[in-house]
């Protein structure tokens, strides 16, 4: 114990020397050593690494509060940037001593945001947070026990009580009983009653007049945009201002794809675990059509507003995914080299990460062409906006049965409208129309994609 105490004081002495900048030769007392150790045995938590080109973010939420014990690498807060949400993790285990910023504050690169006391020992029952919750739940349970000490069996009987049918059965007799009750006073005093009822009728309109304003609310909710929504708004407006956007339309018969999917979806799901959808067919069709119309997969780059046309022999396919915070476009790398099942699997993985807010900046960077499927929400027709610096975006829509003339006969077919918005600065109308026609041909004859 003596050697441990001397070593502890020696460490405190060194800490004091380092912090003060002077050489400390006098002995350090045990109490002073404890004070110094508690003060300096701490770790400052900095902002997480930001993606390239991002210099600041917003502290969205604290997941741990001061006084709670945190483990190493445990998430204690989340930071919202223009593109992704980044978790803040504890570099060491200890008690969260102080929060240096508040929720909603703007934070910059390498900024200190919290302090952890690394000298604190972990509590026996885990972190302090769960203990507080356990106390609250215990108090709530105790309150329930005190409120119903002898009716432990009643909750089972009370469950059907909220049934509207039961309430209506009880209220029905009561609604019929006032009629005879109302008649009895009329027999006892027939004349005074009508006289009293007249002022009541006059007062009822006043009651309804005062009740009308409360039944029609005119409140407004003003919600400040989060960083992602602000960035989305800026980019969409930038696209409209910079690109010479034009949209061309077509429609395709989905009969072949629907039949193919119906025939093999269960077998594919059983063997591979991949749930085949329609997006993979359109993704494959687009990558095949790009081989003939490479401008669709290009971009305009260079100084000023752009003076260089860029053509590519690969396709990094951006897939639009709706999340609670806004639309994101994770990227499937080298989609042109992937099979239908590989594309479908990648879409499922990226979609799950997007909805869970777990996308990394690498997952969304440098797409070359975008597909947006508004049909899953019931959209019948629409014009998508180009995702700069890309030059085109394909919009898919709902599949609806419509009458179609085939070989002189009107027959019902599952049809889908397609919308291709393109930047007319790089893509000519002929190229855009040809590209969309090729996509239509591949979808209406999926086997053709395997032969190209």
Swiss-Prot record:
Q: Which PROSITE patterns match?
A: BIOTINYL_LIPOYL (PS50968), LIPOYL (PS00189)
Obligatory cofactor(s): (R)-lipoate
Q: In which pathway does it act?
A: Amino-acid degradation; L-lysine degradation via saccharopine pathway; glutaryl-CoA from L-lysine: step 6/6
Membrane spanning residue stretches: none
Read off the InterPro entries from this record: 2-oxoA_DH_lipoyl-BS, 2-oxoacid_dehydrogenase, 2-oxoacid_DH_actylTfrase, Biotin_lipoyl, CAT-like_dom_sf, Single_hybrid_motif, SucB
Question: What EC numbers are recorded for this enzyme?
Answer: 2.3.1.61
The similarity comment for this entry is: Belongs to the 2-oxoacid dehydrogenase family.
Question: Know the name of this protein?
Answer: Probable dihydrolipoyllysine-residue succinyltransferase component of 2-oxoglutarate dehydrogenase complex, mitochondrial
What species was this sequence derived from?
A: Schizosaccharomyces pombe (strain 972 / ATCC 24843) (Fission yeast)
Organism lineage reads as: Eukaryota, Fungi, Dikarya, Ascomycota, Taphrinomycotina
Q: Which gene encodes it?
A: kgd2
């Amino acid at each position: 114990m003596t050697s441990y105490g001397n070593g502890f004081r020696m460490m405190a002495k060194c800490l004091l020397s380092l912090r003060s900048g002077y050489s400390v030769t006098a002995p350090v007392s045990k109490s002073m050593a404890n004070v110094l150790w508690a003060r300096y045995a701490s770790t400052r938590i900095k902002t997480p690494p930001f993606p390239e080109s991002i210099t600041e973010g917003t502290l969205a939420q604290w997941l741990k509060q001061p006084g709670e014990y945190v483990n190493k690498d445990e998430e204690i807060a989340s930071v919202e940037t223009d593109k992704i949400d980044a978790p803040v993790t504890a570099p060491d285990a200890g008690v969260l001593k102080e929060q240096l910023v508040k929720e909603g504050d703007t934070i910059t690169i390498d900024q200190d945001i919290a302090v952890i006391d690394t000298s604190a020992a972990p509590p026996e029952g885990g972190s302090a947070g769960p203990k507080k919750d356990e106390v609250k739940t215990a108090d709530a349970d105790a309150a329930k026990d005190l409120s119903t000490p002898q009716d432990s069996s009643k909750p089972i009987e009370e469950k059907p009580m909220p049934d509207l049918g039961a309430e209506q059965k009880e209220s029905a007799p009561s609604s019929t009983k006032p009629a005879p009750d109302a008649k009895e006073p009329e027999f006892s005093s027939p004349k005074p009653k009508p006289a009293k009822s007249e002022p009541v009728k006059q007062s009822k309109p006043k009651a309804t007049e005062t009740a009308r304003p409360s039944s029609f609310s005119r409140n407004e909710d003003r919600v400040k945009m989060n960083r992602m929504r602000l960035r989305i708004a800026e980019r969409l407006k930038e696209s409209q201002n910079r690109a010479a956007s034009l949209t061309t339309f077509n429609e395709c018969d989905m009969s072949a794809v629907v039949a193919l999917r119906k025939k093999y979806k269960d077998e594919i799901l059983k063997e591979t675990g991949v749930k085949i959808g329609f997006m993979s067919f359109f993704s494959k069709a687009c990558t095949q059509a790009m081989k003939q119309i490479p401008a669709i997969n290009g971009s305009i780059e260079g100084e000023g507003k752009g003076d260089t046309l860029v053509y590519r022999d690969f396709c990094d396919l951006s897939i639009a995914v709706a999340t609670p915070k806004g639309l994101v476009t994770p990227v499937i790398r080298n989609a042109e080299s992937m099979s239908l099942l590989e594309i479908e699997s990648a879409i499922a993985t990226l979609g799950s990460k997007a909805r869970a807010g777990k996308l990394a900046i690498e997952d969304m960077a440098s797409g070359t062409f975008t597909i947006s499927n508004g049909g899953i929400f019931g959209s019948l027709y629409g014009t998508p906006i180009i995702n700069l610096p890309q030059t085109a975006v394909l919009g898919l829509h709902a599949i609806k049965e419509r009458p179609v003339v085939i070989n002189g006969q009107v027959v019902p077919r599952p049809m889908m409208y397609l919308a291709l918005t393109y930047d007319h600065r790089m893509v000519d109308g002929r190229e855009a129309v040809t590209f969309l026609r090729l996509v239509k041909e591949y979808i209406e004859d999926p086997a053709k994609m395997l032969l190209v």
